[in-house]
Amino acid sequence: MARTQNPVVIIDTLRTPIGKRNGGLSTLHPTDLLGLVQKAIVERTGIDPSKIEQVVGGNVSQVGAQSFNVTRTVWLSAGLPLTTACTTVDTQCGS
């Protein structure tokens, strides 16, 4: 397998607060919550969004309206570059 000239670099990570059923975050749609995280990382790092090639976001129990690629939808609705690849991972607890 050939080595790539462009290594993968993780610039920053950030997570949302842990919520509970009918808690303070229950009225906030998952895309709005993830949008706050994505925007905060772009602002915090000062990176040019056009330089970001891949975004990975996590979401628990994607059903119904959430069953699409939430990370991609959030990225685009925030007005960030169409050229950025986005992936949503189902991040259920293993306990």
What are the residue ranges of the model-derived segments?
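Short acidic capping loops at alpha-helix termini that bridge into adjacent secondary structure
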Residues: D48-Q54, T83-A85
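Conserved catalytic cysteine-centered active-site region
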Residues: N59-S95
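Condensing-enzyme catalytic core mediating Claisen C-C bond formation in acyl metabolism
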Residues: M1-T31, A40
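Short, well-ordered amphipathic alpha-helical segments that serve as non-catalytic structural scaffolds
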Residues: T31-G46, V70-V74
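Conserved beta-strand elements of the Class I
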Residues: V9, E53-V56
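Short, flexible, glycine/charge-rich loop motifs used to bind or transfer phosphoryl groups or to couple energy/partner
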Residues: M1, T45, G64
